A protein has these predicted regions:
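Protein kinase catalytic-loop region centered on the HRD/HxD motif
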Residues: 119-131
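Conserved short submotifs of the Hanks-type protein kinase catalytic core
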Residues: 82-96, 100
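Conserved N-lobe loop of protein kinases adjacent to the ATP-binding glycine-rich P-loop
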Residues: 30-37
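Protein kinase glycine-rich loop
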Residues: 15-21, 26
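AlphaC helix of the eukaryotic protein kinase fold
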Residues: 44-66
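Activation segment signature within eukaryotic-like protein kinase domains
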Residues: 115-116
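Activation-segment/catalytic-loop signature of the eukaryotic protein kinase fold
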Residues: 78
Length: 192
């Protein structure tokens, strides 16, 4: 765990832990150069020696960094400092779609359509840039306090090329597409 107050890359002050995923912890931070709050995703220590995890982590940053869209969480920076691999992203104050559904229960048709349109807009922008997400699930969708829906966590995203064939099953077991589960060819349709 990263200590509060540590400064990464001589720029990003870690303020407090705000979340955790399978391979990284997420902290609220402050960009001291631009004087704004950010989210700092730090690769868990048990994975820092694993080249595959480090590559996967950097791949997320590279895949998402080129995507500038109101329905995608922006990635600002990626780096390594004191043995910590980190990614700096837009801080979205809100909750995941999973948490939102758990709190609200059944959503109205109007609300469901609004969320779906915003998700599709973000995913469509990624596809237009040649990126497939490969892990779309409620935990990777954030709803901000003002109702803006944003796609996040491009951890297993991949550039769409003729080599976008995987022999490994990727994605979350409950949400993965059949072709991904079989280790087959993944393309934009896998996100739908």
């Amino acid at each position: 765990m990263v200590k509060d107050g540590i400064v990464l890359g001589k720029r990003y002050a870690v303020l407090s832990k705000i979340g955790a995923g399978g391979m990284a912890d997420v902290y609220k931070g402050r960009d001291q150069m631009l004087n704004r709050y950010v989210a700092i995703k730090v690769l868990k220590k048990q994975y820092k020696e694993d080249e595959n995890f480090v590559r996967k982590f950097r791949s997320e940053a590279q895949a998402a960094a080129g995507l500038m869209h109101p329905n995608i969480v922006n990635v600002y920076d990626v780096g390594e400092d004191r043995g910590l691999n980190y990614m700096v992203m837009e801080l979205v104050e809100g909750i995941t779609l999973k948490e939102y559904i758990e709190r609200k229960g059944r959503l109205s048709h109007k609300e469901t359509i609004s969320i779906a349109i915003q998700m599709c807009s973000g995913i469509g922008a990624a596809h237009a840039s040649g990126i497939i997400h490969r892990d779309i699930k409620p935990q990777n969708i954030i709803i901000s306090k003002d109702g803006k829906v944003k796609v996040t966590d491009f951890g297993i995203a991949k550039a769409v090329t003729s080599n976008t064939v995987s022999t490994n099953a990727m994605g979350s077991v409950h949400y993965t597409s059949p072709e991904q589960a079989r280790g087959g060819f993944s393309d934009q349709r896998s996100d739908i």
